[in-house]
Amino acid sequence: SGRVMLYVPKEKWIGKLLEYHTFKIKLDENGKEKWKTIHRGKLINCSDIEIISKFNTEIRGLYHYYQLAHNVSVLGKFAHIMEYSMYKTYACKYRTTVRKMVDKYSRNGVFSITYQTKKGLKWCEFYHDGFKRVREVRLDADTLPEYGRKYNNPNSNAARIKRGVCELCSQQTKD
């Protein structure tokens, strides 16, 4: 039709999946590719809320980048692989099966993790808003959800090391 259109290149979302180490490609006996989701070992030591918010942030980030594209709905495939990689990450963390993790954390058919705030118990749900094409740009697209900013634990090992104070003798460390 002579118009310039924005599309989501297949190589980009597959490249992101490979970059995040969420799946591996195996060849069957006929030489056909088989995609197998895998857990993300680097996230196993993170808290439950950090794991789900990491996956949500990565999915939302790619969606918001390509939300004006004509074929943005192909990111549903991206989200599906990310979802099962997240399930496998939780299953590996708790040394159980994917089915048991889905059954344990599903609430009204949506995978959800609880977290505590000053106002009480809240739920962080896995992204399930779909990938509909947006015709107008949202100005608040870069605003993170509240749990993404507030849930950095000040008593985490990294924060304790950054303080530069020995916890045994209270002396300042050099590094």
Protein language model regions, located:
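Non-catalytic terminal/accessory segments
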Residues: 1-175
